[in-house]
A protein has these predicted regions:
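Conserved radical SAM core fold
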Residues: 30, 55-58, 76-94, 143-144, ...
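Aromatic/hydrophobic pocket-lining residues that form the small-molecule binding cavity
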Residues: 6, 33, 97, 101, ...
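Auxiliary Fe-S-binding modules of radical SAM enzymes
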Residues: 112-237
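Alpha-helix N-cap and loop-to-helix initiation/capping positions
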Residues: 1, 28, 88-96, 152, ...
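A cross-family glycoside hydrolase active-site/sugar-binding cleft signature
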Residues: 22-26, 50-54, 75, 144-148, ...
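Non-cysteine beta-strand/loop elements that form the S-adenosyl-L-methionine
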Residues: 66-80, 173-180
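Conserved Radical SAM active-site core
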Residues: 1-71, 80-81, 119-125
C-alpha cells in the first residue's frame, strides 16, 4: 500500500474507536511509516501510536520515531549470546536490544495512563493500585518490555528480568509471558517442542517478586494456543 493509504488507514481506525495504532514489526518500513504517521497526525490522528518490536533494531531507526510513537512494546528475548545465536541467528541480540530499549525509555519517560471519566493522567504507582477497578484505564505513554519464557531457558529468563529491574526499576513495565507455542518445523530444536509448564512459569514469577518487581503484567493458563497467533490476511487494507 502507499504511504497515503497507510495514513488513511490510521485515521479510519481512529474513526472506528480504536484505542491505539499498533505497528507490529515495522522496522523495515520505518521511513514510510514515519511519513504516513506525520500525514495522519496532520489530518487529526490523536490516539496513541504503539511500536511493537523484537528490539533487534538500530538505535538510529528508533530515533526516527521520536515524537511519533507514544508507547513502545519491545521484546527482550535473551541475554545469553549462545541462545540468541542458536535460536535467532543473532549473537549480538542482547547488545543491540539493550541500546534500542534504552532509546525507547529515553523518548517516553515513565508510563502514564488515562482513566475513563477523569481529565488527568495517572502514573504507575496509582495504576497498580487501581488496575482492578471497573473503570477503563489505558496506557497513553511508556514502555512495556516483554519477555517470553522458552523451555529449558529459565536461567536466562532470570538474567533478563534482573537486568531490566536493575537498569530501569519502575521506569518501565515488564510483561512476563508463558505463551510459547511449539509449531511444526522444530525438528532441529527438539528441546523447544513443548509448552512452558505452570511450575516453570511460577518459578520465574516468584523470582521477579523476590527481586522487588512492582510494574508487571503476568499471564494465566491457556495462552499457549495457535489462536493467539494473528492471521496476517490483509483484512482492512
Amino acid at each position: 500500500i502507499t504511504e497515503e493509504r497507510l495514513a488513511e488507514i490510521f485515521l479510519e481506525l481512529q474513526e472506528k474507536k480504536a484505542n491505539n495504532i499498533n505497528l507490529v514489526t515495522a522496522g523495515q518500513f520505518v521511513p514510510q511509516v514515519v511519513r504516513a504517521l506525520r500525514r495522519a497526525k496532520d489530518g487529526g490522528l490523536g490516539i496513541p501510536v504503539v511500536y511493537n518490536t523484537s528490539s533487534y533494531e538500530n538505535v538510529d531507526t528508533i530515533k526516527r520515531l521520536e515524537g511519533l510513537v507514544d508507547i513502545y512494546l519491545p521484546d527482550l528475548k535473551y541475554v545469553d549470546e549462545k541462545l540468541s545465536a542458536k535460536y535467532s541467528h543473532a549473537p549480538d541480540y542482547f547488545v543491540t536490544a539493550q541500546a534500542a530499549i534504552r532509546e525507547m525509555v529515553r523518548q517516553t519517560g515513565k508510563p502514564e495512563f488515562a482513566v475513563s471519566g477523569e481529565q488527568r493522567h495517572i502514573f504507575a504507582e496509582e495504576y497498580n493500585d487501581r488496575c482492578d477497578e471497573d473503570a477503563e484505564i489505558l496506557m497513553k505513554k511508556g514502555v512495556i518490555v516483554r519477555h517470553l519464557l522458552l523451555p529449558g531457558c529459565a536461567d536466562d529468563s532470570r538474567r533478563v528480568i534482573a537486568y531490566l529491574l536493575d537498569t530501569y526499576g519502575e521506569e518501565i513495565y515488564i510483561s512476563i509471558m508463558n505463551q510459547f507455542t511449539p509449531l511444526k518445523g522444530l525438528s532441529s530444536f527438539p528441546e523447544l517442542n513443548r509448552k512452558i509448564s505452570d511450575e516453570e512459569y511460577e518459578q520465574i514469577i516468584d523470582f521477579a517478586i523476590e527481586r522487588g518487581i512492582s510494574n508487571a503484567f503476568i499471564q494465566e493458563g491457556g495462552t499457549a494456543e495457535e489462536s493467539f497467533i494473528p492471521q496476517f490476511d490483509l483484512e482492512g487494507v
